[in-house]
Amino acid sequence: MVLFRGKYQGSSFTEMLDVEFPHLRIENRLAALGVNAAAAATAGGALSIPHGTTVLALKCEGGVVVAGDRLATEGYRVASRDLQKVYATDAHSLIAIAGAAGPCIEMAKLLRVELEHYEKIEGEPLELEGKANKLAQMIRANLPAAMQGLVVVPIFAGYDPRRRVGRLWKYDVAGGRYEETEYESTGSGSLYARESLKKSWRPGATRDEALRMAVQALMDAADEDRGTGGVDVQRGIYPTLSVCTVDGIEEIPHTTTAEIHRGIVESRRGNG
């Protein structure tokens, strides 16, 4: 086994990168090539960047459900129809991304590396609230890029083994962290998703009830917001659903999501 010995002695991966390998940071690599990303964005006008929306999270009995649509838009065009927006960051936490797709995905993956690195160094996982704080720091560090349009506004959720409940947080563009006690949605269709959840959510909802609420909220958002992708039966594209409980993270298969969708459609037609 090779042990790394350097100047940095903490447990943060990004801080270690800054101290030991600053040349590997993307902004420093661009600077070495003589590229100023902010100046390039200003000089070139608005960047054409894929954006991903809408995502949501809601508490249920014994945990939390996290969901996201699959559409990414680039202005008035479709950038991707099957973008993954919900990522596991460790065995008991999830991030749902909204904003500029590239920076969002990079931050989700970097957070996973951060948490893995912390657990290897400290010998135990970071507490759930500490994970939420770490994400807030990363979003705050992204503020200069956000001022150029590369906004990252995720939802973070997971199971807290100390409190034995599911918890979830929303964030603002400056890294402000706000815990929600029931449900939350972010992205272009978040207003409509929240309105849907306001009508359907109830304390103590079962896992299956919460999954139905999540799919229904995304369907309502897609019905009103052009940036939110609905169910694409022809292509077999359905929202991403994950459940986090004391047993870990369960990714819901698309066949189950399809059944939930059919049940909602039949119910609205008056047949269910």
Describe each PLM feature range:
Residues 1-272:
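Long, low-complexity N-terminal extensions
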